[in-house]
């Protein structure tokens, strides 16, 4: 399994639409950086958010998640309440090749402020906008800046294609648009 370089990421995005829209350089001036980097791609967070609220005093159940537990918000800056989280989506649409798996890690700029981004791996032949989970681990409100970097995606090629890809099994998050809540 090999880690993929900026050249590979750029070629796959330009020739095969792996990342759209694709930023072929790292944009850094006055923003939290995004775009291609040496061995990854810093994706951006879009303007649509679902901010968790516990006004219903409910139990969080991934098998029966109540959509009323979220407040929908659209804007350039999202305020995540203390010790809470928000769901968001990427600006970029991803199409993962059959022999590739990705891992995603949060940006250090946010992590150093107690803001953690979680994303599960993009499996072979998965495609869609990425649903991001953004946790504010601090006792204070935290700002998230739309259309700026939120997490870095690193791409790994397998030594051979999988027998069954995410696309083959018609995974439940295939082709997702918008912020997608848990599905069973």
From Swiss-Prot:
DCTP binds at residues 107-112, 131-133, 152, 166, 176. The active site is at residue 133. Pathway: Pyrimidine metabolism; dUMP biosynthesis; dUMP from dCTP (dUTP route): step 1/2. It catalyses: dCTP + H2O + H(+) = dUTP + NH4(+). It holds the Pfam family DCD. Its EC number is 3.5.4.13. SUPFAM superfamilies: dUTPase-like. It is an enzyme of class 3 (hydrolase). GO terms for molecular function: dCTP deaminase activity; nucleotide binding. It comes from the Bacteria. One of its GO terms (biological process) is dUTP biosynthetic process. InterPro entries: dCTP_deaminase (IPR011962), dUTPase-like_sf (IPR036157), dUTPase_trimeric (IPR033704). Keywords: Hydrolase, Nucleotide metabolism, Nucleotide-binding. The keyword Transferase does not apply. Catalyzes the deamination of dCTP to dUTP. Homotrimer. Belongs to the dCTP deaminase family. This is dCTP deaminase. It comes from Gemmatimonas aurantiaca (strain DSM 14586 / JCM 11422 / NBRC 100505 / T-27). The lineage of its organism: Bacteria, Pseudomonadati, Gemmatimonadota, Gemmatimonadia, Gemmatimonadales.
